[in-house]
């Protein structure tokens, strides 16, 4: 049983690490799939994509990420995500007793 738990733990860590490594590897296909033209550079695309990813994590749903990326990050969803993330950052931290 212990071996099984260890294997599952290691597999989880590897998948998390792999996903983090791939996060910064955006390609020309990403530009096309997000309906972006060449006027946006890859760094700007990465930053906007991070906003959508963080927003999806905040709302605990993947459907947000697709809507956020619509029309090269110009949708109302993207604006709402930016606003929600900014509001979340401005919330006072809860004190732990």
From Swiss-Prot:
Residues 1-19 form the signal peptide. Co-purifies with latroinsectotoxin. SUPFAM superfamilies: Crustacean CHH/MIH/GIH neurohormone. Disulfide bonds join 36-72, 52-68, 55-81. InterPro entries: Crust_neurhormone_CS, Crust_neurohorm, Crust_neurohorm_sf. Keywords: Disulfide bond, Secreted, Signal. Expressed by the venom gland. May increase the toxicity of alpha-latrotoxin and/or other venom components. Is non-toxic to mice and to the cockroach Periplaneta americana. One of its GO terms (cellular component) is extracellular region. Its main location: secreted. It is found in: Secreted. One of its GO terms (molecular function) is neuropeptide hormone activity. This is Alpha-latrotoxin associated low molecular weight protein 2. Pfam families: Crust_neurohorm (PF01147). Belongs to the arthropod CHH/MIH/GIH/VIH hormone family.
């Amino acid at each position: 049983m212990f071996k099984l738990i260890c294997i599952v733990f290691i597999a989880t860590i590897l998948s998390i690490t792999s996903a983090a490594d791939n996060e910064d590897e955006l390609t020309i296909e990403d530009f096309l799939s997000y309906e972006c033209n060449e006027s946006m550079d890859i760094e700007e695309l990465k930053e906007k994509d991070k906003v959508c990813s963080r927003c999806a994590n905040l709302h605990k749903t993947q459907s947000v990420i697709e809507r956020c990326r619509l029309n090269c990050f110009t949708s109302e969803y993207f604006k709402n995500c930016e606003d929600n993330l900014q509001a979340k950052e401005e919330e006072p931290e809860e004190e732990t007793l």
